[in-house]
């Protein structure tokens, strides 16, 4: 769905949205707010790039990060869950991943991105493997 269509749909349905981003560094927030009138639905965008930001702002237990890593479905789930407590938005999104070109491992390669979506009491975690593409490709396609 294009940003234009999403923009119209969110306004029509009086739906609010918030995001917590890591590897996209605010890119999704920027796209969601590019159109006039986005203040009707966009409540907040948090860039929690570092582990410290995830721990201090989103209240992710550091034991989760040390056990599973910041790039994990577990961390992504807590990011979106805790964001929803802060934002009170109807829809909450979280993004954590490895945009590269460095930082990947065999278990967690460059291009691995988790996206969390929370609406109501339902949470969906989507695992994406973009492959070893350019950083901008991974960020723009997340």
Kindly label every feature range from the protein language model.
Residues 1-142:
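Short alpha-helical segments enriched in small residues
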């Amino acid at each position: 769905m294009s940003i234009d269509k999403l923009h119209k749909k969110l306004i029509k349905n009086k739906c609010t949205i918030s995001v917590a981003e890591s590897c996209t560094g605010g890119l999704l927030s920027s796209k969601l707010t590019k159109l006039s009138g986005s203040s009707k639905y966009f409540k907040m965008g948090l860039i929690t790039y570092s582990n410290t930001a995830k721990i201090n702002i989103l209240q992710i237990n550091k034991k989760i990060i040390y056990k599973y890593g910041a790039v994990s479905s577990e961390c992504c789930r807590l990011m979106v869950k805790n964001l929803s407590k802060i934002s009170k938005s109807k829809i909450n999104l979280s993004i954590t991943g490895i945009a590269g070109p460095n930082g990947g491992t065999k278990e967690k390669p460059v291009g691995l991105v988790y996206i969390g979506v929370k609406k109501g009491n339902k949470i969906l975690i989507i695992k994406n493997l973009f492959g070893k593409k350019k950083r901008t490709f991974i960020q723009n396609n997340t």
